[in-house]
Amino acid sequence: MTLLTQQNIIIFSSIDWSTHWQLHHELTTSLTNSGNKVLFIENTGARSPKSGDFGRIINRIRFRIKSFHGFHQVSDKFFLYTPIFIPYPYSKFAIFINTFFIFSAIKRWTKVTNFINPIVVSFLPTPTIQLIIRKINPTLTIYYCADDMARFAQNPNKLRESENEFLRSSDLIFTTSHKMYERASKFSDSVSNFPAGVAFEKFNSSLKAPSVPEDMQAIEGKIIGYVGAITEVLNLNIIVELATTLSHTTIVLIGPKYINVS
């Protein structure tokens, strides 16, 4: 296997960089550690905003104010872009405006920084992102299908239709589950499945933890732990069933909460 290095890579992310650590962060870190330069473009959304998004919107505005027209150099090989956009991904007017302003900003930045002949990796299949990618005209387009976003989309049919088009047009497609691999393979012969992995050294280091956290010291017996975002993706019914069935086990959820779990 040839190591990818000394390349310019643009990542269109489906999350913001400040979000809890996920596949997107691991990919970016791995690419920069391998000698590539990465422009990480924060989430432009696959749905309209909800009331629960208010905190993230405020954080984005604060970061944008501190940056240079939305761009921020994190390290010598890692650059972050926080775009301002109209949050209606399937409105023709919003698509036109968002495409124009986001692409114009990227074009100016790549020209100034000599960020030429980029490879594009996109976690988003939305119409705006696809139009921007065509305008960039990258040497390679990769759709990283990390989640079935249509399951929770407000407009699942529109998102699915847009994703189908992106599956047909992308040079390479990466999936993270057999189900998504099978679906993507209906539209492309260039699909590879890479299930999410584990950074073993991070998990192994927990065995050497100096002490139990103060807010968990009163827990007796075995613990089933979950670390990650507490969102609609989490099957709360299964968790409740586990808690009821395994009466001598405590279930602990650790992470930012975006849904009501009471």
Where are the predicted features?
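Conserved catalytic-core segment of nucleotide-activated headgroup transferases in glycan assembly
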Residues: 95-100, 199-262
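Membrane-proximal helix-turn-helix segments that form the acceptor-binding/catalytic region
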Residues: 27, 104-111, 135, 156-173
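A conserved catalytic-core segment of Leloir-type glycosyltransferases
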Residues: 50-112
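N-terminal subdomain of nucleotide-sugar transferases
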Residues: 1-63, 243-246, 250
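A short beta-strand/loop micro-motif in the catalytic core of glycosyltransferases
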Residues: 39, 169-177, 192, 225
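A short, histidine- and acid-enriched strand-loop-helix "catalytic/donor-clamping" loop
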Residues: 129, 144-156
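Carbohydrate-associated surface elements
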Residues: 179, 194-197, 206
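An aromatic- and histidine-rich active-site surface loop
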Residues: 99-103, 118-136
